[in-house]
Structure formats: structure tokens, C-alpha cells
């Protein structure tokens, strides 16, 4: 997958929001602190032979964009409050520029065999996942109603990541880092 690293302070936001969920036996899997990120594109299983082409392509895209200013703001869930499966924090700021950047990544990777995602890109940071069926549905009302000071961040680089799933969770490895051109 292609992602953006987050400011360290995201951990404080996650901990504060964790305290708002009264799970009463519900199973909620919180993303480990070091694994939180902003996903730009999921590319799925990729042969090692494609990594160089991916990195070369991502480098060419990042060279066409300057730093993107964003903020982490607000909380939400997918698909709906009554049966939330994903708990997240949102992104605001230069969203049009971010959308253009993601579109450019998609457009350049499609000829390499990585299809454009059909779902509209909704920038967010996943904090937790809830699997069903389970005996207790967590009440996410307070999570969704909690406000916090927005956390500014800049996208100045992106990472091509690999993800390996283990019983204790995913382990991410950086396969390439690509820098956006700095603002003068």
C-alpha cells in the first residue's frame, strides 16, 4: 500500500478517543501506535519484481507535487453508527490537492496493472476495527461526539509499504520513500 506517516501526537488523540468507548465486552481491535497511517492507495499482493517499477513511478509522481498541508480533525465510523466496523479520525485542509495527488498516483499505476479503486477516496486514519458477529455491539456515540484540537500535518513524503499479517497484528515494512518537492 501507499501511505503517509503521521505526527507522533496522533497517539494522544487515539488514547483520548479510546477512553470514550465503553465496550462492555465488545471486541474492538485498536491499531497499534506505530501502525497508524494515512492510506493513499491499497495495491494488494505485489510480486517483488514490481517493487522497482512502483518506486520509480511513485518518484515521478511526487516530483510533480509540492507539500500538502492537512489537519487531523474529528472522528467518524464506517459504515454506520449502529454497527460501526471502522473507527477513524478525519482529514481536512488541502483536500483538493490531496485528491489530485491520489488521482495522479492511480493514473500512473493503472498501466502497471494496479487498477484504480472504484470507491471514492475518503481521507481518514483508521484507529480501530470491530468485527461481527459478536455478543455486544459497542456504543460509539461518545467517540463520535468527542472533539479535540486539530492536529496539523504536512505530506512531504509518501511510503510504499508491505504488510505481513501475524497473529499479533500486521507488521509494516517500508519498501520505498518518495519526497514531494518542497515549497519555495
Mark where each language-model region is.
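Histidine-dependent nucleotide/RNA phosphoesterase domain, centered on the 2H-phosphoesterase fold
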Residues: 1-184
Amino acid at each position: 500500500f501507499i501511505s503517509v506517516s503521521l505526527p507522533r501526537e496522533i497517539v494522544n488523540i487515539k488514547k483520548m478517543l479510546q477512553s470514550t468507548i465503553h465496550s462492555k465486552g465488545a471486541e474492538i481491535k485498536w491499531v497499534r501506535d506505530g501502525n497508524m497511517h494515512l492510506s493513499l492507495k491499497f495495491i494488494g499482493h505485489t510480486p517483488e519484481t514490481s517493487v522497482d517499477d512502483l518506486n520509480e513511478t511513485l518518484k515521478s509522481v511526487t516530483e510533480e507535487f509540492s507539500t500538502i498541508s492537512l489537519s487531523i480533525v474529528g472522528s467518524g465510523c464506517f459504515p454506520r453508527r449502529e454497527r460501526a466496523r471502522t473507527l477513524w479520525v478525519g482529514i481536512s485542509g488541502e483536500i483538493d490537492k490531496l485528491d489530485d495527488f491520489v488521482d495522479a498516483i492511480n493514473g500512473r499505476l493503472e498501466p502497471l496493472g494496479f487498477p484504480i479503486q472504484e470507491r471514492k477516496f475518503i481521507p481518514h486514519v483508521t484507529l480501530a476495527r470491530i468485527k461481527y458477529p459478536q455478543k455486544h455491539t459497542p456504543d460509539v456515540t461518545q467517540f463520535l461526539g468527542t472533539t479535540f484540537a486539530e492536529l496539523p500535518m504536512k505530506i512531504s513524503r509518501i511510503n510504499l509499504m508491505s504488510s505481513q499479517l501475524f497473529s499479533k497484528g500486521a507488521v509494516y515494512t517500508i519498501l520505498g520513500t518518495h519526497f514531494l518537492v518542497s515549497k519555495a
